[in-house]
């Protein structure tokens, strides 16, 4: 299940763990990424809390926790190569994995069609 937020994050659910990243739209708006800061594994995040930072030559932008849960993994490759996040934001450029407190909360997020309309 793939879902999107109005803060331009995407989530892909596998069991009760969601992989989180920025959308292609967000990556395009930011331009070339030069720095990525990710949350620490084991940290509990609350929906809406700043979880990560992506910085481009244009601007720095917070990435908010789309749902509440515990960080189980971070994309180390994104730390060493921030450009990979912009090059493949919804694939190899994922940011972190979040074990969700409530999987059913995914239902409140936008599906791909709704996000495409939102991002126009």
From Swiss-Prot:
<dbReference type="GO" id="GO:0005960">
    <property type="term" value="C:glycine cleavage complex"/>
</dbReference>
<dbReference type="GO" id="GO:0019464">
    <property type="term" value="P:glycine decarboxylation via glycine cleavage system"/>
</dbReference>
<comment type="subunit">
    <text>The glycine cleavage system is composed of four proteins: P, T, L and H.</text>
</comment>
<dbReference type="InterPro" id="IPR000089">
    <property type="entry name" value="Biotin_lipoyl"/>
</dbReference>
<dbReference type="Pfam" id="PF01597">
    <property type="entry name" value="GCV_H"/>
</dbReference>
<dbReference type="InterPro" id="IPR011053">
    <property type="entry name" value="Single_hybrid_motif"/>
</dbReference>
<protein>
    <recommendedName>
        <fullName>Glycine cleavage system H protein</fullName>
    </recommendedName>
</protein>
<dbReference type="InterPro" id="IPR017453">
    <property type="entry name" value="GCV_H_sub"/>
</dbReference>
<feature type="modified residue" description="N6-lipoyllysine">
    <location>
        <position position="58"/>
    </location>
</feature>
<dbReference type="InterPro" id="IPR003016">
    <property type="entry name" value="2-oxoA_DH_lipoyl-BS"/>
</dbReference>
<dbReference type="InterPro" id="IPR002930">
    <property type="entry name" value="GCV_H"/>
</dbReference>
<comment type="function">
    <text>The glycine cleavage system catalyzes the degradation of glycine. The H protein shuttles the methylamine group of glycine from the P protein to the T protein.</text>
</comment>
<keyword id="KW-0450">Lipoyl</keyword>
<feature type="domain" description="Lipoyl-binding">
    <location>
        <begin position="17"/>
        <end position="99"/>
    </location>
</feature>
<dbReference type="GO" id="GO:0005737">
    <property type="term" value="C:cytoplasm"/>
</dbReference>
<comment type="similarity">
    <text>Belongs to the GcvH family.</text>
</comment>
<dbReference type="InterPro" id="IPR033753">
    <property type="entry name" value="GCV_H/Fam206"/>
</dbReference>
């Amino acid at each position: 299940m793939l879902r999107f937020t109005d803060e331009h994050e995407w989530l892909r659910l596998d069991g009760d763990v969601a992989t989180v990243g920025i959308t292609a739209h967000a990556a395009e708006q930011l331009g070339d990424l030069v720095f990525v800061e990710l949350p620490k594994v084991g940290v509990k995040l609350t929906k809406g809390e700043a979880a990560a930072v992506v910085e481009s030559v244009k601007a720095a932008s917070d990435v908010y926790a789309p749902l509440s849960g515990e960080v189980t993994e971070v994309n180390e490759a994104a730390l060493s190569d921030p450009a990979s996040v912009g090059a493949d934001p919804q694939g190899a450029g994922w940011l972190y994995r979040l074990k969700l407190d409530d999987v059913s909360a995914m239902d409140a997020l936008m599906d791909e069609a709704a996000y495409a309309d939102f991002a126009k």
